[in-house]
Curated annotation (Swiss-Prot):
The keyword Cell membrane applies. Its main location: membrane. Belongs to the major facilitator superfamily. YcaD (TC 2.A.1.26) family. The chain crosses the membrane at residues 14-34, 45-65, 79-99, 102-122, 131-151, 157-177, 204-224, 235-255, 270-290, 291-311, 325-345, 348-368. This is Uncharacterized MFS-type transporter YcaD. PROSITE patterns: MFS. The gene is ycaD. InterPro entries: MFS, MFS_dom, MFS_trans_sf, MFS_YcaD, MFS_YcaD-like. It comes from Escherichia coli O139:H28 (strain E24377A / ETEC).
Length: 382
C-alpha cells in the first residue's frame, strides 16, 4: 500500500493553503498593531491570546473528532480560522484583536490536531516517519511562501484580509473530494494526555517541546517587531522571516538523518547549543543573515527531534495521546514565551528577545547534559 495515498495527498494540499494564510497573518499582525501605536506589551499579549486559543483548540479537538469525524472537524477548524481572519477587519483595537486572535488560535490548533491525527491513523509503524516528514515539510514550505508573499504584495490590512480569508476557505476544497477514516480510534480511548505528560522516560522530549514553543513563539510573535524597531521595512521583514523559515526547511532532512544515525540525545544537545550561538550572533549584529540561518536551522528542527525522543518511549497504541501531549506542551511554551519576553522588551531592551531565547535554551542544555541514560530501541518509528 502506498504511503502517500489519495486522502493523504489531498489533506496535505489543503494544509499548504492554510499554512500560507497562517504564516502571512502571524507576520503582519504584530506590525499592524505597531502601526496603531500599541505598546510592545500589548503586542505580546495579543500574540499570547493567539497561543491561548491554540491551547483551547488542542484540548477540544479530540472530542470534536470523536463526535463528527476527521473531514467535518477539518471543515469546522477552517471556518473558525477564517472567521478569526475576517474579524480583524471589523474593528481595529486592542480588545477586539485580542478576541479575534484567540478565535484564530483555536481554529489553527484544531487544524494541526486534525491533520496530525489523520496522518497518524492513516499510517503504520513502517511509514509514519515519512508521513510526519511530509507534514513538517508542507508546514514549513507554506510558512516560507507566506513570508515571501509578505515581501511582494501590499501589507495594508484591508488589502491582505480578503485574499487571506479566501486562501483559508480554499484549503477546504481538497478534502471535499475524499474521506479520511479514523481506523484506529478504538486503540486510543484508554490513554490520557495527563498520563503521557507524567511519563518519566519521556520527560526530556516533553521539556524539549515546551522549550521549542518558547523559542518559536517568541520568534514568530516578536521577531517582526524587533526588526521593525531596528528600522527595517515591512517588505524586508518578510524577507528576513523567509530566511529564518527557509533554514528550518533545509534543516529538516539532514538533522532527521543525523538523529537516526547518532542518536537523538546527541543531536538535541548540538541543536540547543547552536540556538544559543545564533542568539549571541544576533545580539552582536555583525552578520544577521548567517545568524538568522543557523537560528532557524536549529530552532525550527528542535520540535520534531524532541517529539521523536518522546514518541519512541511509548507503545504503538499510545502514539496519538503522546502526540497530543507534546502539542499541548509546545502550545504552553508558545503561550508563555511571547508574553513574558514582550514585557522584558518593553521594560528594558529589544535585545532581551535573544537573551531570553539563549537563557531557556541553556537551561534545556543543562537538562540534556545530565545522565539521561542510554536511548532504548524505539518502540515505534514516528
Amino acid at each position: 500500500m502506498s504511503t502517500y495515498t489519495r486522502p493523504v495527498m489531498l489533506l496535505l494540499s489543503g494544509l499548504l493553503l492554510l499554512t500560507l494564510a497562517i504564516a502571512v497573518l502571524n507576520t503582519l499582525v504584530p506590525l499592524w498593531l505597531a502601526q496603531e501605536h500599541m505598546s510592545t506589551w500589548q503586542v505580546g499579549v495579543v500574540s499570547s491570546s493567539y497561543f491561548t486559543g491554540n491551547l483551547v483548540g488542542t484540548l477540544l479537538t479530540g472530542y470534536v473528532i470523536k463526535r463528527i469525524g476527521f473531514n467535518r472537524s477539518y471543515y469546522l477548524a477552517s471556518f473558525i480560522f477564517a472567521a478569526g481572519c475576517a474579524g480583524l477587519g471589523l474593528m481595529i483595537g486592542f480588545w477586539s484583536w485580542l478576541a479575534w486572535r484567540f478565535v484564530a488560535g483555536v481554529g489553527c490548533a484544531m487544524i494541526w490536531v486534525v491533520v496530525e491525527s489523520a496522518l497518524m491513523c492513516s499510517g503504520t509503524s513502517r511509514n509514519r516517519g515519512r508521513l510526519l516528514a511530509a507534514y513538517m515539510m508542507v508546514y514549513y514550505v507554506g510558512t516560507f511562501l507566506g513570508q515571501l508573499l509578505v515581501s511582494k504584495v501590499s501589507t495594508e490590512l484591508m488589502s491582505v484580509l480578503p485574499w487571506v480569508t479566501g486562501l483559508t476557505l480554499a484549503g477546504i476544497l481538497p478534502l471535499l473530494f475524499t474521506r479520511v477514516l479514523n481506523q484506529q480510534a478504538e486503540n486510543h480511548d484508554s490513554t490520557s494526555i495527563t498520563a503521557m505528560l507524567k511519563l518519566r522516560q519521556a520527560r526530556l522530549g516533553v521539556n524539549g517541546c515546551i522549550i521549542s514553543g518558547i523559542v518559536l513563539g517568541s520568534l514568530y510573535g516578536l521577531m517582526p517587531l524587533y526588526l521593525n524597531h531596528k528600522g527595517v521595512s515591512n517588505a524586508s521583514i518578510g524577507f528576513w522571516m523567509a530566511v529564518l523559515v527557509s533554514a528550518g526547511i533545509l534543516g529538516q532532512w539532514p538533522i532527521g538523518r543525523l538523529a537516526d544515525k547518532f542518536g537523538r540525545l546527541l543531536v538535541l544537545r548540538v541543536q540547543v547549543f547552536v540556538v544559543i550561538l545564533g542568539s549571541i550572533a544576533m545580539l552582536s549584529q555583525a552578520a544577521m543573515a548567517p545568524a538568522l540561518f543557523i537560528l532557524g536551522a536549529a530552532g525550527f528542527t528542535l520540535y520534531p527531534v524532541a517529539m521523536a525522543w518522546a514518541c519512541e518511549k511509548v507503545e504503538h497504541h499510545q502514539l496519538v495521546a503522546m502526540n497530543q501531549a507534546l502539542l499541548l506542551s509546545y502550545t504552553v511554551g508558545s503561550l508563555l514565551g511571547p508574553s513574558f519576553t514582550a514585557m522584558l522588551m518593553q521594560n528594558f531592551s529589544d535585545n532581551l528577545l535573544f537573551i531570553m531565547i539563549a537563557s531557556v535554551s541553556f537551561i534545556y542544555l543543562l537538562m540534556l547534559l545530565r545522565n539521561a541514560g542510554h536511548t532504548p530501541k524505539p518502540v515505534a518509528h514516528v
